[in-house]
Amino acid sequence: MLETFGKIFKVIRESKKMSLKEVAAGDISVAQLSRFERGVNGITLDSFYCCLKNMAVSLEEFQYVYHNYIDSDD
């Protein structure tokens, strides 16, 4: 599940043409965010929310993309 969250996060970030640095915005290290996107490490919920906010993505939007991704795998 962690790997899937990171993968979806990366898809959203790239679709917005944002760099890791822009999304991290000092709330989290770029390296840590990169590891999260690759499914290597997790991040705190606070960091996750901050990064979503930096991309102007609501939690509901992320959940929508996540559920569509999961449903398409079935």
Regions found by a protein language model. Give the residues of each.
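Residues that mark the N-terminal boundary/hinge immediately upstream of a DNA-recognition element
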Residues: I8, S19, T44-S47
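Short alpha-helical DNA-recognition segment
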Residues: K16-R35
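A short, Lys/Arg-rich alpha-helix, primarily the initiator
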Residues: M1-S15
